[in-house]
Amino acid sequence: MLATSAAEPLALLRQYWGHQQFRPGQQEIMEAVLAGHDALALLPTGGGKSVCFQVPALARPGICVVVSPLIALMRDQVENLRKRGLKAEAVYAGMSHQEIDQALDNCVYSKEIKFLYVSPERLLTDLFRARVARMNVGLLAIDEAHCLSQWGYDFRPPYLRIAELRALLPATVPCIALTATATGQVRQDIVEKLNFRPGYGIFTQSFARPKLSYSVLHTEDKFRRLLEVLRGVGPGKTGIVYARTRRQAEDTAAWLVQQKLPAAAYHAGLPPEQRTRVQQAWLADKIRIIVATNAFGMGIDKPDVRVVAHLDAPATLEAYYQEAGRAGRDGLYAFAVLLSGPADADSLRRQATLAHPPADVVRRVYQALANYSRTAVGGGELVAFDFDLGLFAETYRLKAVDTHHALKALEQQGFVQVTEAVNQPARVQLISNQQDLYQFQVANAQHDLLIKALLRLYGGELFVAFQPISEGALSRHLRQSTTDVVRQLRYLHSAGVLHYQPKRELPQALFTTPRYDAPQLPLDERRLQAARQLTEQQTAAVIEYAASTSRCRQQLLLNYFAEPDALACGVCDVCLAHKKARQAPPDTARLQAGLLELLRATPLLPRQVVARYPTAEAPTIASALRTLVELGQLAYAADGRLSVGATKA
């Protein structure tokens, strides 16, 4: 166990992040981890989850192994750590065996590397198991921990093997799991699946966003209402519009430009360079509105987004909460607007049905994937390959929708994995020593110019580790075609002079087990049925949220995330309508005084307070309680009860 004063984490925060204080709840989480306890941290979107494991990782000896499901998010966090002067490595699909080997070696032998990010399917390969056993691991962090639970909205079977990883580590290594979206059932699942040890803590912050106004606008003309919303937040304010399909994103962005609103589309089908340009222009406020599919937003840090609008409801409230929560992270008032049409509920139900194709379709897609990747029965485990969904479906005459959902089913059963699109530059490492390289150049004059160009443009670091290169830059330097440069690099790779990894732009797919003969694929029919039932429940929750005209929007969301005592927010469309409808509100000062007198005598849960008044006054009582909390006259205790004055959590 490491004895660490509270001052040390704060000093690290100030030194590397430049923040003067922790956000609410962060310090308690860190203290538990630094005391050697397991911890589950449930923080709202934008609540500073990464700091909760990064700071303790620096305060503890050894390296922090971070399990993360998204390549883009992993790479962003590694890049951000390196910018802060902290050393980090990452291992994920699309890297060569040599790159993975080198990254893991660095973590074994370098005491300066503090973070190793790893995608879940890489955790228990023979290579990883052998190397992690030799690492001085000080902390295990599980990002997006809801992926552990089959009841979560993004279940990923490789996460279930994290418990096996824990068995390889000393018992003194604590585990911290973090998520922004977890129902009560998912929380229990996380604790059990990670084998949390006695003394563990669950740290929850309310998912409430007091200054985020949730609204549902029922309309037959979504474009017109969208325009009203975007103009209504004020000139120059930035926003995100979420569309269901790539085509819808492009059409909506084009229409907004016609209406004199600076907008651009963003989706996974665009070339990586274009996606980067659009994202950077939006971050720099050169584009006001970004119209995106759900491929956009994860890991994006733009606190001044004033509005997030959805043209259609997402499939789950978890997804909606995360996407809507990208508005107003600066703590100022912001808006989350869902546009709902007359046929939307029926459309959601149809999509829920389509989301679970029959087993014979799933097997057919599995066989097609084997043909596409030319993978023999018994082979291909964890060998990544470029994957173009459109081309794949067209080649094997599959319906794109069925194919997408069949791949999801195969992922949830633990047979395949498809990553998001990656934009990874070509990489090279010289593996000949300088004397052997010189002799090769003398004997192979036709490759001498390319080798000299590599050394001139990228330096001696090429002998030490993989370095990103540009085939285009080499082409211009040598005045040769890019095709010729790539051909030479491939030859030098095959000749054992260097390791060459070509540029990757497409999503990566891989088999997470040795490939089965499709008819013998051991699909678990019970799990397929359970997944159907879960989707039906999630769809019903979204439909209820959109249809409600009597319950506070934020209260509905918080109840879904196991906050039964949540107060009405006072700023959503439903709460504002209730305020407007009340003709004769009670004397506010007298009501507040009565509540203070009541709670001074006996701390109570909010629902217990509300229950003491007539049902018709419930919204008024909830509003008064919220006001007293905001004024600091009431405070929450650790058990959720309200009492007068400051209370220790």
For each predicted feature, which ranges?
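C-terminal accessory/connector segments of nucleic-acid motor ATPases
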Residues: 357-515, 520-624, 633-636, 643-644
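Short, amphipathic C-terminal "tail helix"
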Residues: 630, 645-648
